[in-house]
Every structure is written in C-alpha cells, then in structure tokens.
C-alpha cells in the first residue's frame, strides 16, 4: 500500500505570512517568501500571490480556469469514503468500495437510484477530482478524527495533481449534537464534543440567561473541525418553528425569533473565526433555510408535493418571525445561505412586505429559483455578500415551481436567473455542459421556450458561471485552503479529545433539562425502591434503553414489579414518522399507541379514510403502571424526550413529576431527577394542548395558524377555544401551569 498523503506533507513557513503545505505541488521561493504554484504558471501571479485579497485572487483565477473546470465547481453532492467506512445507504444498493493505493479513497463507481433527491451515477474518486473537476462534496460518514484528517488530506493531494490546483471543499452537516443520526440532518454523534440537540441548547440558554453557552459551543466546533481539515458546515438552522408538525423542528433553536437571532449573532463569528467572513482558523457556515422553513402548511415537509408551499396566513409574519435570524447571518458575513425547497403561496397568504415596505410578490417558485427572494430581498435589500448554496435535490425531485423545465434549464434558471452559486445533490457535468452549450448552439431555434420564461434565463452563461465560481473560490482563499489544505491527524485527535470541551458539553446537557411538574416528588432520595422502564418507537429499542437505564441507577433499590415500587421512573422517547418518508396523514404529535387518525389526500386535505399511528410502543401500558404505583402511595416520575413539540397530556396526567429533554443524555436527566443538579432549563417552544388546537378543516386550514409561533397563536384562535385566561393553544397541567415557551420550574 502506498504511503498516505498525511505522511508526505512538506511545510514552508513564511515570516508574517501563511504556512505553505504541499505534497507534490511546486513551491516558488521569491524574495525570501514562499508561494504555491496554484495556476501552474511557475510565477508569483495574482492567483498565487497570498498578499492579494481573496476576492482579487478569485477574480484572477476564473479567467485562468477552463469552462469545464468551472462547470465542475457549481455542483456538490454526497461523497463516500474508502472501504474502512462503507456507506450503509450505498451498501444496501450493493455498492462495494474499491480502495485506492492509500486505502483511504473509493475508486468504484456507484449508481444512486433509490434516493429521494433523485438518481445519479457517480464516478470513482480519482475521476471526480481529475476529470470532472468537482470541488465540493458532502461527507456523511462518521470516522475518527485521525481517519477524517487522513481522508481529507488524501483528497487534497489528488487535487494537487491537476494542472490547475483548486482544493476540495468537503462539507458536512452538524456533528456536535446528540441524537439519532439522520441522513441529511446530522452526520455524526459522539465523535466530536457532543452537546444536546439544538432545542436543548436553546433551553439551556433560556434557563441560564448565559449566551456564552453559544460562544463556547461555536468555539469548540471551530477548533475541532479546523484541526481535522473539515472547513465547511451545512449548519445551522435559522428557521423559526411555527407549525409543530414540521419534522425538522428537532434541528432548530425553537420558536423564539429574538433568541434565534441572538444565537446566530454569537454562533457565526464563533465558528467562522470572526464577523468579517471566515478566517484561516475558522470553519465556514451555511445558514439555512432562507427565508425560513417553519411556515409549513400543516407541517408537511417539502421533500414531498404536499409540503411544497410556504403559507403566510397572518399579515407580516414573514418579517416578524421568519427573517430575523437571517439578519444576523448577514451582519456577521456567513459565507453561504441555503434557500428552502418550498415556494410561497399567494392564494393562501396574507400580505407580506419587503424591507422597503412594499408588498412582496409571492411568485410560486421554489426559493432557490425565486429571484424576488434571492436576488431582490436577500442580496439587494438585506445586503448578503456570500454565496447561495441550494438545498439537496432541487434539479431532480424537489424542483417546485419549475417542474415544466428540463434539467439543464433548471440549472441555468437557478444560476443565471435567481443567483444560485452552488447546486446541491448533483454532480453531473454533462447537464451543466448542456445548459452552457444552449446559450450559443441555437438550441431554442428548434425547441420551444417554456411558457413564462425567457431563453436567456434558462442557460448557463460565462457571466453567471464566473460569478458563481468566483464566490466559492473566494471562500476557499479566505479559509487559507490554497496555501495550507493539510491537517495533522495526531493534532486532530488531541484537539477533539480536549477534556474541557466535553465537560462543557456535559454541563449544557444538564442545563437543558426542563422541570415541568413537581408535586414535591423531586429530587428523589437514595435507597428508594424504583421501577424503571424506558419506552421508545420499537420494543427492541425500548428493551435496550431500559437495560441501560437500570444500569445507571446504582443508588436505588430496583424492583421488577410496579406494585412494589415507591417510584416509577419512566423515560419516554416518542417518535413520529421518519425523516424523508412521507406519512399517510398529518405528523402525529400525540404520545399514543394504535391511535386511529385520518388520512390526507394529495393536496393535504383530510379524508374519510383512516390509519393507525403509534408514536410510543407501550404507551397503553403506562396508565396501568401508574395505577399500580399510586395504589400504595407511590409516585410516578416521567421524562419525555422532545425533538418535537409533543402533546404531553397522556403522560402528564399520570405523572407526579415531569421533566423534558431535547436529545439530552439520560445521565444528565437523572442528575436532575436525583438532585445532583438543580433544574434550570426553560422551554424553547410551546407544547400544544392537544389534537383540537391542530385540527384541520375540510379545506385544509388549521385552526391555529401555520406561520405563527406557539407563544403567539392564541391571538388568532377562536374565542370559543380560550379559557378564563384567554389561552387556547398551550397545554395546561393539573397545577394550572401552561407549557408555553419560557416555562420551567425549579425545585
């Protein structure tokens, strides 16, 4: 096996300048300074001269690169590692990795045919780098820090061997929060310093009033990723949750637009290394999903036709709730912003205004194809200077509003007309070449221009191609990747193992626990008799979680019969639907088992047909457990994991004490329950009262508006649903407390 690139790196230190690292690329020495021969000229050209600004160097380089090389740089898609870390998704399709000489890269081509994002054929890694000149890929695997650094170094070495050197920008979804690893959402858990879910981070910030939680979180991400050579994150979600049935609630910071904006005021400079764009020691962020994905029509996900619309049913909701965090992204110069798949619905929306006080034209195009929002609002009015990175799959399956265009036209329309700079979910240079060729080959002399479109907007042009590539090159120059793309695997392992970072993350886990109810039950005492059981979406998962829970309870007497227990300790982890899988009805938020619910038709309206929903296996047993414990004066202590805003009534009614967490470690929850850590967390979103406040009528209209956060929904709900305090939406417990945003008890 050949020597890994990591073992062959040579470094040249400039006095008062960047380190130059290379394996084989020529290094130019001039006037006591070192320069890398990026463009292959062998001179200190504008491209090679690190003393010029990143923008100046990028502008010079687009004049050197060939058209084919530039087309390869407007696409990004998932990429795989070598045989040591095979992709489970690709393995299910029969793909068998073939190692390169280093053992790190996969040289076997692959056909992706079962993806919701669309089908595509992907070449070997060498062909992707050398022939296609693709320079943006998305990494989903979860290697060790050392292996990650080795893999990234090997990719960078391949890019060095091309005539024109452009380093590889390897992107990843977030890797520093706990939770089930979900394709396309978070790409690792437990490898890097691991915080609770983003909702839990928000709960901790609210409860402690300490925004420095975000500062430390961001700094940890920056140091860990940078040490590994991972320089770009598809993170974080600036979306404000306004419909609780949105599956992606679990990746947000909740429903408080002011807090979300404040979080991004700290998150972006902390990760990128400053507020003036990414630094060589920083990691670029892609803030998503402009102009806010929370305004879901009855929670439907835009990966599917029923969820293709953003509905703004209340006047001014776009500006008031959904835009604020993106202002922070622009203030602090986030390197890129990702528009959402969905498109605005004028027919079902109230008037919305732009930043000049003028009505916004809610043209029915997906936001990546929507010039009004991207070029008009985001760039011209809000002043965004970075690049636009589309969400995954907009050219294939999620092409809402432009489905009448063919794929080359969608590429041209996104890049040339609306201003997208990087198209995600596609590595297909042939489609890009076709879109470019149509600008000059007379294609539309023999083919009809689709109605409502102009032919010049449907093709890639030199102007739009240069603009897009110049923006992504500028980011790479800012990151210092042209000069020093290689990471030190040993240092990567040391940085990720920093004890203080893991301890800080563990503390935030404890701070994320929210105490909702306590009839003098908590904290529990040592030595009490405890019946402990965990409940999940499957019997297998519940059994494994119960075993792990009982092993954590060393200070109590465990009993197997609830009737013999002083305390029943129930850890409840519901799950509704599955990400990237459409549900036959509305996303179920009741904690239930075999519940009969309505189906929906293709337009999202309820039908007379029904199906069964289970969000918690064993939910129907919980009242019996509680009854057995209560029969002799015992108490029930329950904890609910809340990646979604569950309807918690069925659990609260039988519980004497109730806590919630947000992908919070069970050990942290037990610290609160047993008094080892006093509860401080506050709810980052409102928990709905029940099905009645999420009811959808025959026309598909929800009784609580889809575009308004839970804390503000009461103003728009029928008076007949409101109680003596004028409240209708939030759950109210036996003690009279409303489980609204910002609620949380202490002992």
Each predicted region: which residue ranges?
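N-terminal hydrophobic targeting/anchoring segments and the immediately downstream early-domain regions
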Residues: 1-203, 212-215, 221, 226, ...
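C-terminal non-catalytic regions of proteins with extracellular/luminal or membrane-system context
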Residues: 1-32, 38, 92-122, 208, ...
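Hydrophobic faces of well-ordered beta-strands that scaffold small-molecule active sites
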Residues: 75-77, 135-139, 168-174, 232-235, ...
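Glycine-rich tight-turn/loop motif centered on a GG-T
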Residues: 137-142, 187-212, 244-263, 300-320, ...
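Second-shell residues forming the walls of enzyme active-site clefts
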Residues: 154-164, 255-467, 471
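A short helix->loop->beta-strand "cap" motif at the edges of active sites that frequently abuts
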Residues: 166, 383-386, 420, 629-636, ...
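Short, conserved phosphate-binding/catalytic loop or strand-edge motifs used
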Residues: 172, 237-248, 489
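Helix-enriched interaction subdomains in cytosolic or periplasmic regions
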Residues: 463-514
């Amino acid at each position: 096996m050949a020597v890994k690139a990591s073992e062959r790196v040579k470094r040249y230190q400039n006095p008062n300048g960047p380190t130059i690292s290379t394996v084989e690329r020529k290094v130019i020495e001039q006037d006591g300074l070192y320069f890398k021969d990026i463009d292959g000229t062998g001179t200190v050209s504008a491209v090679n001269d690190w003393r010029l600004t990143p923008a100046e160097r990028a502008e010079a380089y687009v004049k050197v690169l060939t058209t084919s090389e530039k087309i390869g740089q407007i696409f990004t898609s998932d990429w795989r590692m070598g045989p040591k870390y095979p992709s489970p998704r690709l393995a299910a399709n029969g793909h068998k990795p073939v190692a390169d000489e280093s053992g790190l890269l996969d040289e076997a081509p692959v056909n992706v045919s079962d993806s919701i994002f669309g089908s595509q054929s992907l070449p070997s890694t060498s062909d992707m780098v050398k022939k296609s000149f693709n320079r943006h890929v998305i990494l989903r695997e979860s290697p060790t820090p050392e292996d990650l650094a080795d893999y990234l170094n090997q990719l960078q070495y391949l890019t060095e061997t091309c005539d024109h050197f452009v380093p590889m920008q390897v992107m990843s979804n977030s890797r520093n929060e706990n939770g089930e690893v979900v394709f396309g959402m978070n790409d690792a858990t437990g490898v890097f310093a691991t915080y609770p879910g983003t909702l839990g981070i928000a709960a901790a910030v609210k409860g402690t009033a300490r925004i420095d939680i975000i500062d430390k979180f961001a700094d940890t991400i920056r140091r860990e990723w940078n040490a590994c050579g991972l320089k770009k994150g598809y993170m974080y979600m600036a979306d404000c949750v306004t419909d609780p049935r949105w599956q992606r609630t679990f990746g947000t910071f909740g429903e408080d637009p002011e807090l979300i904006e404040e979080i991004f005021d700290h998150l972006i400079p902390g990760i990128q290394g400053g507020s003036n764009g990414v630094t060589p020691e920083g990691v670029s962020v892609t803030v998503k999903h402009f102009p806010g994905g929370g305004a879901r029509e009855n929670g439907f996900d835009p990966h599917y036709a029923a969820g293709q619309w953003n509905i703004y049913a209340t006047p001014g909701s776009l500006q008031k709730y959904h835009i604020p965090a993106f202002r922070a992204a622009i203030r602090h110069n986030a390197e890129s912003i990702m528009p959402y798949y969905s498109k605005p619905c004028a027919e079902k929306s109230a008037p919305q205004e732009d930043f000049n006080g003028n009505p916004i034209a809610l043209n029915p195009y997906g936001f990546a194809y929507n010039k009004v929002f991207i070029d008009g609002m985001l760039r011209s009015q809000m002043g965004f200077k970075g690049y636009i990175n589309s969400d995954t799959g907009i050219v294939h399956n999620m092409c809402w509003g432009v489905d009448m265009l063919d794929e080359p036209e969608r590429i041209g329309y996104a890049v040339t007309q609306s201003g997208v700079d990087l198209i995600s979910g596609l590595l297909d240079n042939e489609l890009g070449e076709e879109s470019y060729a149509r600008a000059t080959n007379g294609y539309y002399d023999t083919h009809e221009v689709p109605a409502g479109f102009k032919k010049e907007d449907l093709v890639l042009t030199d102007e739009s191609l240069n603009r897009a590539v110049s923006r992504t090159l500028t980011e790479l120059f800012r990151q210092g990747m042209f000069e020093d793309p290689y990471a030190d695997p040993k240092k990567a392992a040391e940085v990720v193992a920093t004890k203080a970072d893991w301890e800080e993350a563990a503390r935030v886990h404890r701070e994320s626990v929210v105490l909702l109810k306590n009839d003098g039950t908590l904290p529990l005492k040592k030595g009490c008799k405890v019946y402990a059981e965990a409940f999940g979406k499957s019997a297998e998962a519940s059994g494994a979680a119960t075993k792990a829970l009982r092993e954590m309870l060393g200070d109590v007497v465990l009993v197997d019969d609830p009737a013999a227990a002083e305390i029943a300790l129930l850890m409840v982890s519901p799950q509704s639907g599955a990400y990237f899988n459409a549900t036959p009805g509305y996303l179920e938020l009741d904690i239930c088992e075999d519940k009969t619910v309505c189906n929906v038709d293709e337009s999202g309206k309820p039908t007379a047909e029904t199906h069964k929903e289970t969000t918690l296996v064993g939910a129907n047993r919980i009242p019996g457990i509680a009854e057995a414990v209560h029969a002799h004066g015992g108490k029930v202590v329950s904890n609910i994991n809340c990646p979604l805003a569950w309807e918690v009534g069925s659990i609260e009614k039988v519980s004497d004490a109730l806590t919630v967490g947000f992908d919070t470690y069970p050990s942290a929850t037990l610290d609160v329950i047993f008094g080892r850590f006093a509860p401080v967390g506050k709810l980052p979103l409102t928990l709905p009262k029940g099905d009645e406040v999420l009811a959808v009528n025959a026309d598909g209209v929800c009784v609580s508006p889809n575009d308004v956060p839970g804390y503000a929904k009461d103003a728009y709900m029928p008076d007949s649903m409101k109680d003596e305090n004028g409240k209708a939406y939030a759950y109210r417990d036996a003690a009279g407390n409303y489980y609204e945003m910002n609620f949380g008890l202490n002992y």
